[in-house]
């Protein structure tokens, strides 16, 4: 009897101990009764029916991280690359996470790999490097929709490394080298072009300044010549005015004027004749003789100098011929 009582006491104590469940914060348990879902245990103190109830799933509701291994992908322009990613997710419905999919984390990894291959296959190689943010947003949206039936919320997806094959890397290196050389050649040609333009502009400005200087000099010369002619005209006008007054007031002024004109006429011929170069002068002997005779009548024969006498003799000889 005592043995039976002891056995009952141990069994009852064990049943009571297994029926008490303490759930930590941010954790949840799923309980089945006789093979079917019964209830969900929340953080705190919970009780179950011994033997009939069984905890079948324990999981946290905190955010978790899945490290996606490198995956081979083909871009839209048929370039082979490898890409890996990190996925941040958490369970929002414990019942769906257990009953809707058999192995939740494995299913998540395979789904992410499939989505990465799908999204990268829509882009060309250059776009995969420049549109990483857009790819992350697309992956997040697609994964969130696909995992919603599993009671999972995907909070963030980050592509980490996108690595082309070695052949593609070598080709990209050659392309970048060619681009750098092209940019250097363009910069050099632009510098030479700017230098030529600056030189041409400098020459043009110099020619403009030179032309303006010549123009100003020509204007100044013309103004000086104009002023000279004006002064000469004024002097001539004043001389003519004085001469007119003299001729009108003095009876002998006309004869003096004729003498001066005749003397200048003879001096002109003497000056031309003294030149070394040969020249031909067409003169009317009658005009010369009349001029000389006018001079002779004014000053008399004795007042003529030797040069004038020589000129008269030459004219006489010319007349005789």
Swiss-Prot record:
SUPFAM superfamilies: Band 7/SPFH domain (SSF117892). The chain crosses the membrane at residues 3-23. CDD domains: SPFH_paraslipin. Keywords: Membrane, Transmembrane, Transmembrane helix. The keyword Zinc does not apply. GO terms for cellular component: membrane. SMART domains: PHB. It is a single-pass membrane protein. It is found in: Membrane. Belongs to the band 7/mec-2 family. This is Uncharacterized protein slr1128. It comes from Synechocystis sp. (strain ATCC 27184 / PCC 6803 / Kazusa). The lineage of its organism: Bacteria, Bacillati, Cyanobacteriota, Cyanophyceae, Synechococcales.
